[in-house]
């Protein structure tokens, strides 16, 4: 699948460019059944040589319609949430000081869990990202707690962007 090549290319780009700090970030689609294994393997591979820093962005998933066709995603949101939160815990326990993580989430529980883990593990290398116009209350709360927050704006032609934006609205209807 194309995801295999994207994973390998992203890992190689981190090896090449993240020598002094994390410049290149790899996105982990945590709704995929193989995502946690890929994440842990990347940590193990890096720890064996310790010659570059990890840039990691955890998302629940972005290509639902395409990935569903290949039977590679969890069947329920509960399973996806569990896998995502397991990833949050793993990176907060196993990271090096210069590793950098972005948690792209509108999920209050995942954010609260990460804040707890940041404090417990005394790390400061986790930032947050949310879609512009969604979860502004969570973003504001994070900023008030001196956390780094990124707002992103998807772009593209309407035909390609509409399914993504519609799904984001549907998934996050309760928080609007």
Residue ranges and their predicted role:
Residues 1-176:
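Positively charged, amphipathic and often flexible ligand-engagement surfaces
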């Amino acid at each position: 699948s194309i995801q295999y090549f994207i994973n390998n290319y992203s890992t190689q780009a981190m090896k090449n460019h993240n020598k002094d700090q994390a410049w290149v970030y790899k996105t982990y689609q945590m709704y995929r059944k193989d995502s946690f294994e890929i994440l842990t393997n990347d940590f193990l591979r890096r720890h064996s040589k310790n010659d570059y820093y990890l840039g990691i962005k955890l998302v629940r998933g972005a290509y639902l319609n395409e990935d569903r066709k290949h039977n590679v995603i969890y069947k329920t949101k509960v399973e996806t949430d569990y896998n995502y939160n397991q990833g949050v815990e793993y990176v907060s326990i196993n990271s090096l000081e210069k590793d950098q993580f972005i948690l792209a989430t509108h999920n209050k529980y995942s954010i609260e869990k990460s804040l707890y883990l940041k404090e417990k593990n005394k790390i400061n290398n986790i930032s947050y990202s949310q879609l512009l116009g969604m979860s502004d209350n969570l973003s504001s709360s994070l900023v008030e707690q001196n956390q780094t927050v990124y707002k992103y704006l998807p772009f593209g032609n309407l035909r390609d962007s509409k399914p993504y934006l519609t799904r984001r609205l549907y998934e996050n209807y309760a928080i609007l």
